[in-house]
Amino acid sequence: VAIFILVLVPFIVAQSKTEVYYTLFDSLPQDLVGIVGTNKLGEDFGMTPSHFILVHDDLTATQVSDLCDELKDVDGITQVVSLDSITGPGFDTELLPDSVMEILQSGGYKLILANSSYKTGTDAINSQLDKMIGLIKNVDPEGVITGEGAMTKDLIEVADVDFKNVNVWSIMAV
């Protein structure tokens, strides 16, 4: 038991000092072609993380437009757009080309696009996503949000559980 406790103490100290990060681009050499290209897109065109929101297509244009307005008020959201927020409730979508409708409304869902000023993998964007998910679920309990920010947030949550489980089992094995 004494040996176990002596070995356990360094494990606990090391674990508490280990910083886990998920901004993978920051950990790579900044002169890599992909990193340079991504940085250039951000600088030249203001490219920011985009959130792709899917809500059921039985929501009215007014409901979707109202949701877009609420999402615009979330800290760090720079713009929100959907077919309904552009056309309004009285617009006949049959006038639009099928190719446009396949992107914006198909498979039983409507697409909403929201851009964020926050960097992916940070506490700020994770908090932003939590607020957005709350707003979306108020309108459509089965609505979903995806994109780089949401997927990284999911990765963080899953990896955190995995790391904790591996640590516990590793300590127990020792």
Where do the protein language model's features map onto the residues?
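Structured non-transmembrane domains adjacent to transmembrane bundles in polytopic membrane proteins
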Residues: 17-174
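Signature of alpha-helical transmembrane segments and their immediate interfacial
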Residues: 1-23
